[in-house]
Each structure stands twice: as structure tokens, then as C-alpha cells.
């Protein structure tokens, strides 16, 4: 495809936008006393009350020990509680504390403000167009094995790729 627009420049702008967004989201997480990956855990446990660490790990496509570390940290901060499963004492069930609910709600609100700032000056039609452009680009980049994977699955795939690459070196 021949064009006067530099694809490289567009990709650089998309990458810059992604980095700026992540920095601003990270600032909001820290302001609310969370590490970056903790809000998705809190929100998952809120939606799936009394879930297991394994279920959270499966959803986020990370290892159970990785979730165990986060859960331990979140317990210590008073955000989550572990409750022994009465029907099977081998399992612990996770619940969000009142403090965790308040922080989750506040953090989500702050994250939404970052997103609102990002899209300020765009009308609804422009946002729909932008979403459509991104969907087309995503479709262009899909391969059979990645076609139906969710966000967390794609992150896990990326990690596997880089882990495999570093093992080869």
C-alpha cells in the first residue's frame, strides 16, 4: 500500500499514547494505594464473590503463585480477605473488604477520569469512528491462534513469546 502518511509515525504515536495512558493510570493507582495490577483483581473478586485464587489467576492468565503474592499483599493492606471453604478446607475463598470496595470504586472513578481526559474534545461519532479504526487494525493483525483471545490472554501470549525468545538467546 503506497501512502504519504508514515505508518511508522502513526505506530509511534499509538505507542506514545499507550505509554502516557499507562503512566497516568499508574499514578492514579498509586494515589489510591494500589499497585497497577491490583484493581483488576479487586474488580474480579467483587464480581465473583468467594472465588478462588486459581479462578482469578485463570481469568488474568497469570500463574497462581503470582496471584498468591498479590493477594497476600492485598490482604495485608486490608483490601481482601481469605475465608476457608466450608465444604472443602483445601480451598480459600476471596472476598473484598469494605476498604477494598471503597478503594476499588474510587480508583475506577479516577481511571475513568483519565479516559475522559484522553477523549476530551471528541464527539460520540468520532469516538465510534476511532473504535472502528482500531477494530479494523486489530482484525488485520489477528492470526488464527490469536483471533478470539481476550486482553489478558494476549498479554500472556506476549509474555510467552518474550520468555521463549530470551531462552533462545
Predicted regions and their residues:
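C-terminal regulatory/oligomerization modules of transcriptional regulators
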Residues: 1-2, 125-169
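N-terminal leader segment of winged-helix/HTH proteins
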Residues: 1-32, 163-169
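Charged, amphipathic alpha-helical coiled-coil/dimerization segments
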Residues: 75-135
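Short, locally clustered residues in the helix-turn-helix/winged-helix DNA-binding domain
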Residues: 15, 43-47, 108
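Residues within the helices of the helix-turn-helix
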Residues: 54, 72, 92
Amino acid at each position: 500500500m503506497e501512502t504519504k502518511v508514515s505508518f511508522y509515525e502513526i505506530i509511534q504515536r499509538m505507542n506514545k499514547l499507550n505509554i502516557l495512558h499507562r503512566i497516568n493510570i499508574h499514578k492514579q493507582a498509586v494515589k489510591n494505594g494500589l499497585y497497577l495490577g491490583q484493581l483488576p483483581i479487586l474488580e474480579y473478586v467483587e464480581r465473583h464473590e468467594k472465588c478462588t485464587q486459581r479462578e482469578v489467576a485463570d481469568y488474568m492468565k497469570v500463574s497462581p503463585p503470582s496471584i498468591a503474592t498479590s493477594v497476600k499483599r492485598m490482604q495485608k493492606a486490608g483490601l481482601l480477605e481469605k475465608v476457608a471453604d466450608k465444604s472443602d478446607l483445601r480451598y480459600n475463598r476471596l472476598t473484598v473488604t469494605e476498604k477494598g470496595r471503597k478503594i476499588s470504586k474510587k480508583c475506577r472513578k479516577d481511571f475513568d477520569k483519565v479516559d475522559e481526559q484522553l477523549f476530551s474534545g471528541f464527539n460520540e461519532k468520532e469516538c465510534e469512528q476511532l473504535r472502528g479504526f482500531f477494530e479494523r487494525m486489530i482484525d488485520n493483525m489477528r492470526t488464527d491462534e490469536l483471533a478470539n483471545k481476550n486482553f489478558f490472554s494476549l498479554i500472556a501470549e506476549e509474555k510467552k513469546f518474550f520468555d521463549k525468545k530470551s531462552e533462545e538467546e
